[in-house]
Regions:
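Dinucleotide-binding Rossmann-like beta1-alpha1 core, especially the glycine-rich loop
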Residues: 49-102
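Residues forming the flavin
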Residues: 2-65, 105-431
Length: 431
């Protein structure tokens, strides 16, 4: 009987396990995660626990190979779309009110955008942050009923690829254990980037460096962007320059809240969107992210930038006219308000001018915006060097029974991460 060990209970690992049990996989499935099950996972633990960061996110499932990673490079366009649709179907399947899922499917780029920005058009399902928690509980119950074994609040301390052994210990270091695997699915997510780097260094895995992805979380009253929201709920404005490209990312509307993420002890920002009308605040927030190519040691560079924009043990907020917003719980967003951008521009080492220009051009496209906006600094997507894998099943070229998925393979977004896990499970079922 085969043993499948999945490191990380994020979107990739959970979709892999679901694909296996849906098809009556006869082996054992073990999932190890540093966080908690969905019944015990607190709201502030946004990176670990059942469904990982994706399960505590804005709740939007994009359906396109233009964004989110290199899925179509691995499997081709048609297969990539099929895999992502399976992920969407899983979220719908465990949703307590699937009829409330909203599909945005823009088809034509509006003329008022074209002089200043490109607009990427693709379908997007809006699940809702508040419903993700209930989805997680139903999904977890299903996997438990199918015999999947979870090891909560446990951290993997070592993987021996030669002996197919995973060693893990409880986060309070009071107990430890070993699991042997026939197939290992490595999906540690953002919170495991350091461990991923250690593993790749220990086993001298061939890798490809990924560019810097850093920027700000922009927030303004929704009314200024309504004419674009009517075209595309999760709009993606973008522009490409020689060594820097910019895009708006993870747009939240109607009941939109800025969320704090803590990684490596530093604060950064993201956004959530609720579906329940009682949370409506008529705000919009989205990331303005730069992808910067050609930076030496991009991961280290990103870490240093984030450290340099911390003040009073949190990130920073700047606005010409506004003050920081509150969370959906009515608590002020953790941030330090500053009255000018000098310290931010210094930390970004000359690259902040691209964000300045992006905001200036938004004020031209949306003339009512003027100074009615604010930015939370930083927003960052840490991307460790990407290991080289076999495209057919995402297995390491040196260790064919070890599969990298999700953020560990530079996926960005729920749909692509889930598709990684689904693909690996399909290949396991074939063998």
């Amino acid at each position: 009987m085969k043993n499948i060990v999945i490191i990380g209970a994020g979107v990739a690992g959970i979709n892999a396990a679901t694909k296996l049990v849906d098809n009556d996989f006869k082996g054992n499935i073990h999932i190890i995660d540093m966080g908690k099950n969905p019944y015990e996972r607190p709201y502030e633990e946004v990176m670990t626990g059942f469904l990982g960061a994706g399960g505590w996110s804005d709740g939007k499932l994009t359906y396109s190979t233009q964004i989110g990673g290199q899925l179509s490079k691995y499997v081709g366009e048609d297969k990539a779309m099929e895999l992502m649709k399976q992920v969407v179907d899983n979220f719908s399947r465990f949703h307590p009110h699937p009829e409330q899922i909203v599909l945005s499917n823009p088809e034509e780029e509006p003329e008022f955008i074209k002089p200043y920005f490109g607009l990427r058009l693709f379908p997007c399902w809006h699940i809702g942050t508040d419903y993700l928690h209930e989805i997680g509980k139903s999904w977890y119950d299903y996997l438990i009923s199918k015999g999947v074994k979870f090891y909560w609040e446990n951290k993997v301390s070592n993987i021996n690829f030669s002996f197919n052994k995973v060693t893990f210990e409880s986060v309070n270091e009071k107990s430890w254990g070993n699991l042997f695997y026939d197939r290992l699915i490595f999906g540690v997510g953002k919170s495991g980037i350091d461990f991923t780097s250690e593993i790749m260094k220990e086993y001298n895995l061939p890798t490809e460096e990924k560019p810097v992805q850093v920027g700000v979380r922009f927030e303004a009253p929704q009314k200024h962007f309504q004419k674009l929201i009517d075209v595309a709920y999760d709009f993606k404005l973008y522009r490409k320059l020689d060594n820097v490209s910019l895009r708006s990312f993870c747009t939240n509307n109607n009941a939109a809240y800025v969320a704090v993420e803590e990684t490596y002890g530093d604060h950064s920002y993201n956004g959530h969107a609720k579906k329940d009308e009682s949370f409506r605040n008529d705000m919009t927030n989205f990331g303005i992210l730069m992808e910067i190519r050609g930076v030496d040691k991009p991961f280290k560079w990103s870490r240093n930038l984030v450290k340099n924009v911390q003040k009073n043990s949190t990130g920073m907020y700047y606005s010409p006219s506004r003050t920081p917003s509150t969370t959906s719980e009515g608590i002020g967003v953790s941030t330090t308000q500053i009255d000018n951008l000098d310290i931010i521009r210094l930390a970004f080492q000359g690259y902040f001018k691209y964000i300045d220009n992006f905001i200036d051009d938004m004020k031209l496209v949306f003339p009512t915006l003027k100074d009615d906006w604010g930015i939370y600094v930083p927003e960052v997507k840490y991307l460790a060097p990407e290991p080289l894998v076999d495209y057919s099943d995402l297995s390491l070229t040196k260790y064919p029974n070890v599969h990298f998925v999700g953020d560990a393979l530079s996926a960005r977004g729920i749909s692509v991460s889930g598709a990684h896990g689904t693909l690996v499970a399909e290949k396991i079922l074939e063998n």
